[in-house]
């Protein structure tokens, strides 16, 4: 049952008189009282998006109103109910696994297991990419089943597991879900997720520094290795040689190997036949673009996770217009929520449809067009945009450019990094995450991104 506090009740009552009805009903009323101690008022928002929005736009107003009511300074902090529930769920799952491990004599000290599981962070894994967040459809049923089988019984019949499919269809999600599952089941498991670009860079660094022994130990002393974008081994002869021996060492030791690519093994070019043969010796599972029913389910699940109440007709509208991949679909969802929050318009098909043109940044847009449009818009040179300059105007423009290139082309993170002067894929990933976060809380950023999209849309139509 929700805790009731007279001070927060009075603050809400006062804000209801001063704020517009849509603002109050959307942001203030859903916020729950958590505690009030020593002048610190803690409120719980329904989700991370709402928490960030309240912090950015209403914190000062709430503090001022609370001071008027209390007669002394009050500080306000916001927590996300989504994160709290996620923490409690994870804790509950870990507690169950502690009992299971204890029953099986894996450990006599459940507290040790719990502390190890909390402190040991899986190498390179994104916390969002877990099995329970993956929506299974006819397009991905085989890949999901194979991934789950490998997670439950690694190093057996599906070794290697080769997951293939186009950009933004969930390959990385499934790979990393395997890693998370193994670490939850066995906190001592050595799990490593790595892109082919990172593996290549490590090999090059090892050669230059005469440190190949350390590199080999790093990649061969694991229980589960997850290699993403293996197609980028193309033409890299020495890296292929090193990966061949790494593959053999892992396979012979019984370690599980999971590989992802944008195409099946027999369609990879510029890669040694002996590697192709090894890629094909286990299980190959492909992921196809999701059908309408699956796309609808994906959006419904995302809305539930974000505690957003989107009308069913709007979900069906978005699902019907964005058909290429899941990344594009979720990007449309994020833009719709951000647009409605910033403009104050209702979440209806009529209000959202004009800004959800799937052709606004389509695959006909080239990396060069994105760089040129971003450069012109922010009035920075293209050389400066792809440089390593950390000046705020330049770095912000660069982040937006990376975000738009990810949304509007079929380039992978490493390839986008190459377009921006050879940046690492982790830099690109960070940039995209930053822009996605700002789109939800910063109207200025949202406006800039939309204006550049409009400019790219004009270019796109010229090329039709």
Curated annotation (Swiss-Prot):
Skewed-composition ranges (Polar residues): 105-116
Gene Ontology MF: a single term: lipid binding
Binding site for ATP: 168, 170-172
Region span, Disordered: 99-120
CC per GO annotation: cytoplasm; plasma membrane
Region (Domain III, AAA+ region): 124-340
SUPFAM superfamilies: P-loop containing nucleoside triphosphate hydrolases, TrpR-like
Region (Domain I, interacts with DnaA modulators) residue spans: 1-79
Domain of life: Bacteria
Function: Plays an essential role in the initiation and regulation of chromosomal replication. ATP-DnaA binds to the origin of replication (oriC) to initiate formation of the DNA replication initiation complex once per cell cycle. Binds the DnaA box (a 9 base pair repeat at the origin) and separates the double-stranded (ds)DNA. Forms a right-handed helical filament on oriC DNA; dsDNA binds to the exterior of the filament while single-stranded (ss)DNA is stabiized in the filament's interior.
Protein name: Chromosomal replication initiator protein DnaA
Organism listed in the record: Prochlorococcus marinus (strain MIT 9312)
């Amino acid at each position: 049952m929700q805790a009731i506090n007279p001070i927060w009740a009075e603050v809400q009552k006062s804000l209801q008189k001063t704020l517009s009805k849509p603002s109050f009903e959307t942001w203030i009323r859903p916020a729950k009282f958590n505690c009030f101690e020593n002048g610190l008022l803690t409120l719980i928002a329904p989700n991370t998006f709402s928490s960030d929005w309240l912090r950015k736009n209403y914190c000062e107003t709430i503090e001022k109103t609370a001071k008027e009511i209390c007669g002394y300074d009050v500080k306000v902090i916001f927590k996300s109910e989504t994160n709290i529930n996620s923490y409690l769920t994870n804790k509950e799952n870990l507690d169950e696994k502690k009992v299971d491990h204890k029953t099986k004599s894996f450990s006599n000290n459940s507290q040790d297991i719990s502390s190890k599981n909390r402190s040991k962070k899986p190498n390179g894994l994104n916390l969002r990419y877990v099995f329970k967040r993956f929506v299974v459809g006819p397009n991905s049923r085989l890949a999901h089943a194979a991934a789950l089988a490998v997670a439950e019984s690694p190093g057996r019949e599906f070794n290697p597991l080769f997951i293939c499919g186009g950009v933004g269809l969930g390959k990385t999600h499934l790979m990393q879900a395997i890693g998370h599952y193994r670490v939850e089941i066995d906190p001592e498991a050595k799990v490593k997720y790595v892109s082919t670009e990172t593996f290549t860079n490590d090999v090059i660094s090892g050669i230059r520094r005469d440190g190949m022994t350390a590199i080999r130990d790093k990649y061969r002393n694991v229980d589960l290795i997850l290699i993403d974008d293996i197609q980028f081994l193309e033409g890299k002869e020495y890296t292929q040689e090193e990966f061949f021996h790494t593959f053999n060492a892992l396979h012979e030791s019984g370690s599980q190997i999971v590989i992802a690519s944008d195409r099946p093994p027999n369609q990879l070019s510029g890669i040694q036949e002996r590697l192709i043969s090894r890629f094909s010796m286990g299980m190959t599972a492909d992921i196809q673009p999701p059908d309408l029913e699956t796309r609808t389910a994906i959006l419904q699940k995302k809305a539930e996770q974000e505690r957003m109440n989107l009308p069913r007709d709007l979900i069906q509208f978005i699902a019907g217009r964005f058909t290429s991949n899941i990344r594009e679909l979720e990007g449309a969802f994020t833009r719709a929520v951000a647009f409605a929050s910033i403009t104050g318009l209702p979440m209806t098909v009529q209000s959202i449809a004009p800004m959800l043109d799937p052709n606004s940044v389509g695959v006909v847009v080239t990396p060069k067009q994105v760089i040129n449009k971003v450069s012109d818009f922010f009035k920075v040179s293209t050389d400066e945009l792809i440089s390593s300059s950390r000046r705020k105007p330049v770095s912000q423009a660069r982040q937006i450019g990376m975000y738009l290139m990810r949304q509007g082309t079929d380039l992978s993170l490493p390839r986008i990094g190459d377009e921006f002067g050879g940046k690492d894929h982790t830099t690109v990933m960070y940039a995209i995450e930053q822009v996605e976060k700002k789109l939800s809380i910063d109207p200025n950023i949202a406006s800039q991104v939309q204006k550049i999209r409009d400019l790219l849309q004009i270019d796109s139509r010229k090329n039709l």
